[in-house]
Amino acid sequence: LAALITVALRPSLLVWAPVFAIVMGVALWEVVRKRPRSLLSGIATVVASVLMVPVADHTIRGSINGIAWWWALMLGIYFTGTIIYVKTMIRERNNSRYLTFSIGYHAAFVLISLVFAVLASCGVVTGFSPYTRLWWTVGTWLLVIAAAISLFRSWAVPRSAHNGGKWTPKRVGKTEQLVALGVDIALAL
């Protein structure tokens, strides 16, 4: 009902329907194939979730500015990495190839964040942000720090677990909340 009311008030939102149909179709296909916890299903769910940022911007403004796409991209990269990392701790905990993939993925996140931070510091990407250049630059460097922390934990926590550390799914989730908070703060600036 809420979706119908929203579309009635802002019919231009229907432009998003095909995108969400594809993304959610992938997730549903994985459920039908009895693989609701697959990496593909998780990524499809992340994409659907982070696309809500530009959808919300579109709803409010009637258009989408660069910061909404920046948020969606960085949140998508971060949360996909979280799925990969959690798999190394639970379903793929003894899979060294998956652990290597996770560490490599998180290293790429650091690199992408670093490129944006350097470009922000040089004033190249200031057009993305409605905020002042200083806050935009600070936020991008905080994102580099959050990405580096996520890279470190993608290596250190599985290593700790392998060496006998007690890492229950609950503990993994609770510690991940701190990293997620760091990413959110960095993006909010």
Residue locations for each model-derived region?
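Small-residue-rich segments of transmembrane alpha-helices in multi-pass membrane proteins
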Residues: 1-2, 43-58, 100-115, 172-188
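C-terminal ends of transmembrane helices
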Residues: 23-38, 81-99, 153-168
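Intramembrane alpha-helical segments
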Residues: 2-5, 11-12, 16-56
